[in-house]
Amino acid sequence: MYACSKFVSTRSLIRSTSLRSTSQLLSRPLSAVELKRPQMPTDESLSSLAVRRPLTSLIPSRSFQTSAISRDIDTAAKFIGAGAATVGVAGSGAGIGTVFGSLIIGYARNPSLKQQLFSYAILGFALSEAMGLFCLMVAFLILFAM
């Protein structure tokens, strides 16, 4: 941020009585230089400064920090839940592999049951894929609907 600051050289800053204060003002970044003329304090502003405030007003409010922390916790819980639901999609892939692996083993043991084994394999594939899509849908619901 210091590298991005712009240096100021206006007429009001150059009108200084000493050379030293002018060079100090000209070398200060724009964010540190006050370009407006200072306002004279009025009686109302002085009386508001003199009002004593209770000590409880000096304690900073924690509501902003608490809400930011609770939002972070909610976001983390959302990502953890979506990640856990995504693991179900990987389980679907493992289930499909198991179904077709069992089809190959069953066909190798008894080739005469080819049609019945294939029917059961398609049913197992459909159920496993449906569970995977359900898990993916739950993951997207957790991420974008909550």
From Swiss-Prot:
Cell compartment(s), UniProt: Mitochondrion membrane
Role: Mitochondrial membrane ATP synthase (F(1)F(0) ATP synthase or Complex V) produces ATP from ADP in the presence of a proton gradient across the membrane which is generated by electron transport complexes of the respiratory chain. F-type ATPases consist of two structural domains, F(1) - containing the extramembraneous catalytic core and F(0) - containing the membrane proton channel, linked together by a central stalk and a peripheral stalk. During catalysis, ATP synthesis in the catalytic domain of F(1) is coupled via a rotary mechanism of the central stalk subunits to proton translocation.
InterPro entries named among the record's database cross-references: ATP_synth_F0_csu (IPR000454), ATP_synth_F0_csu_DDCD_BS (IPR020537), ATP_synth_F0_csu_sf (IPR038662), ATPase_proteolipid_c-like_dom (IPR002379), F/V-ATP_Csub_sf (IPR035921)
Gene (UniProt): Atp5mc2
Gene Ontology annotations of biological process type: proton motive force-driven ATP synthesis
PTM-bearing positions, type N6,N6,N6-trimethyllysine: K114
Major site of localization recorded for this protein: mitochondrion
Subunit record text: F-type ATPases have 2 components, CF(1) - the catalytic core - and CF(0) - the membrane proton channel. CF(1) has five subunits: alpha(3), beta(3), gamma(1), delta(1), epsilon(1). CF(0) has three main subunits: a, b and c. Interacts with DNAJC30; interaction is direct.
GO annotations of cellular component type: mitochondrial membrane; mitochondrion; proton-transporting ATP synthase complex; proton-transporting two-sector ATPase complex, proton-transporting domain
Membrane topology (UniProt): Multi-pass membrane protein
Residue range covered by the transit peptide: 1-71
Other remarks on this protein: There are three genes which encode the mitochondrial ATP synthase proteolipid and they specify precursors with different import sequences but identical mature proteins.
Superkingdom assignment: Eukaryota
Biological source species: Mus musculus (Mouse)
Keywords: CF(0), Hydrogen ion transport, Ion transport, Lipid-binding, Membrane, Methylation, Mitochondrion, Transit peptide, Transmembrane, Transmembrane helix, Transport
Disease (UniProt): This protein is the major protein stored in the storage bodies of animals or humans affected with ceroid lipofuscinosis (Batten disease).
Parts of the chain that traverse the membrane: 87-107, 122-142
PTM: Trimethylated by ATPSCKMT at Lys-114. Methylation is required for proper incorporation of the C subunit into the ATP synthase complex and mitochondrial respiration.
Gene3D superfamilies membership: F1F0 ATP synthase subunit C
Protein name: ATP synthase F(0) complex subunit C2, mitochondrial
Site positions for Reversibly protonated during proton transport: E129
Family assignment from sequence similarity: Belongs to the ATPase C chain family.
Entries under PROSITE patterns matching the protein: ATPASE_C (PS00605)
